[in-house]
Amino acid sequence: MAELGLNEHHQNEVINYMRFARSKRGLRLKTVDSCFQDLKESRLVEETFTIDEVSEVLNGLQAVVHSEVESELINTAYTNVLLLRQLFAQAEKWYLKLQTDISELENRELLEQVAEFEKAEITSSNKKPILDVTKPKLAPLNEGGTAELLNKEILRLQEENEKLKSRLKTVEIQATNALDEKSKLEKALQDLQLDQGNQKDFIKAQDLSNLENTVAALKSEFQKTLNDKTENQKSLEENLATAKHDLLRVQEQLHMAEKELEKKFQQTAAYRNMKEILTKKNDQIKDLRKRLAQYEPED
């Protein structure tokens, strides 16, 4: 039997939809056939017709067939929308975002593959004995219990992750400002020392001692300011390290939540999509750690 690359459960769902569509298509074709049959019985009673009479008959038949085909195409489009709505509603319960590729709907190779699949399914169903078995309806997703707790935990971790990102951004700004101010103070001190060296040859001997004392006092004051800034920088670096530890803790909790989710719905279609989301989260965390490394002061 031809395959569509789906698991057994989803393939059975596709078969059920194709049977439904085939049934609707058959009913509509019977309606079109009846239009022609009614025309034969009601209008084709004379042996000869004029050109005007033939045109009138064909125009009337065209209008009826056009209406029937248009109605079926519209109904088919609405039916497909309802089917997509069911799938999207189930995905949203697991906080998933599904995507569709409209261009694939006109892929001739894939369309032929679906046609072969339908032919194989019809052949297979004709060989199977007809059993009076009522197919169970799709059970709604469980909104309570372990699944609900896991979803709430994921939301909490995501919120905490956003808070940590905001906190890290604030610490980064503070650290950058502190480094800039420290650089400015060091440059000012160097300029003052350079200016002192340039002026030593031009000042009188009796004023040299006073100037050196003034420079020493200024240097002491600058050094004190630099020490204060250094302590402030150390505090910011400690906050940065704490934030990193918190980020690692959140990453570990996200990893644990991912494992719990994998155990919970490892047999469902949502498993692959959820795993992709968690992988993207870990990639975002890795990217954030790389960005943090750029702001760490060099030894």
Swiss-Prot record:
Keyword 4Fe-4S among UniProt keywords: no
Keywords, ordered alphabetically: Coiled coil, Cytoplasm
Compartments, as annotated in UniProt: Cytoplasm
Residue segments, region Interaction with BSS9: 145-299
GO cellular component: cytoplasm
Pfam family of the protein (one): Leu_zip
UniProt-listed InterPro entries: LZTFL1
Keyword Cytoplasm: yes
GO BP term (any one): negative regulation of protein localization to cilium
Coiled coil stretches, renumbered: 96-296
Family: Belongs to the LZTFL1 family.
Function: Regulates ciliary localization of the BBSome complex. Together with the BBSome complex, controls SMO ciliary trafficking and contributes to the sonic hedgehog (SHH) pathway regulation. May play a role in neurite outgrowth. May have tumor suppressor function.
Subunit structure: Self-associates. Interacts with BBS9; the interaction mediates the association of LZTL1 with the BBsome complex and regulates BBSome ciliary trafficking.
Name of the protein in question: Leucine zipper transcription factor-like protein 1
Lineage of the organism: Eukaryota, Metazoa, Chordata, Craniata, Vertebrata
